């Protein structure tokens, strides 16, 4: 699975349109009791999935600020996947792209939004139960960009028994000094304070115990 992540990084740009695409299912959804709403996701199945009994490794892809369609629309990830498989550089795998909203893929400190709980307790088991996946640590990986990079590191570090590898591309992470000094206050409150606590605070008062538990 680590080889898959490496090649995806190398091939995320410069893909031409000459390759047939794997099975691409966009606009799928799952109801989340933790979030109390439907959560959209896309899933890309390797060519030949429908005609085999193989169990495939799964790559979960966390997007940055924006929405979950950006990996497919701008990142060409389905073409990347298909090209690498056809060239024999990697073995076939399943790609899952959930809508992460602006959650940083974290549970909020006050319990008002439980995205990590949804991902770990609901989405991963749902994918394992409804698709032919490898259900072991070496069969699951996460890759994330920006906000998704933060989430990939944060989620995988607290759930090491589930994920065998992780890649964070330009992750939205801060040193403690940057976190304490970042402004303007309203922007910090909306981006960080609402998730990790410390709304309206400055300096070391922003370094809540909840933030320290979740910051990569």
Where are these regions (language model features)?
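Non-catalytic cap/lid and distal C-terminal segments of serine-dependent acyl enzymes
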Residues: 19-216
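Sec-dependent N-terminal signal peptides
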Residues: 4-14
């Amino acid at each position: 699975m680590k080889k898959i992540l490496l090649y995806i990084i190398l091939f995320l740009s410069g893909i031409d349109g000459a390759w047939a695409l794997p099975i691409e299912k966009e606009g799928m959804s799952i109801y989340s009791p933790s979030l109390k709403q439907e959560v959209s996701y896309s899933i890309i199945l390797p060519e030949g999935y429908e005609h085999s009994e193989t169990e495939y490794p799964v790559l979960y892809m966390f997007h940055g600020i924006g929405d979950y369609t950006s990996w497919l629309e701008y990142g060409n990830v389905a073409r990347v996947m298909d090209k690498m498989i056809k060239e024999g550089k990697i073995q076939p795998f399943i790609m899952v792209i959930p809508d992460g909203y602006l959650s940083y893929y974290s549970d909020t400190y006050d319990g008002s939004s439980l995205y990590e709980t949804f991902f770990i307790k609901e989405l991963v088991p749902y994918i394992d139960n409804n698709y032919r996946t490898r259900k072991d640590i070496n069969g699951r990986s996460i890759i994330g960009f920006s906000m998704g990079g933060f989430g990939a590191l944060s989620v995988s570090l607290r759930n090491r028994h589930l994920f065998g590898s992780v890649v964070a591309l330009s992750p939205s992470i801060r040193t403690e000094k940057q976190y304490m000094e970042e402004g303007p206050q309203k922007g910090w409150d909306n981006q960080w304070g609402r998730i990790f606590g410390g709304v309206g605070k400055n300096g070391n008062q922003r370094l809540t115990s909840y933030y320290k538990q979740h910051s990569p």
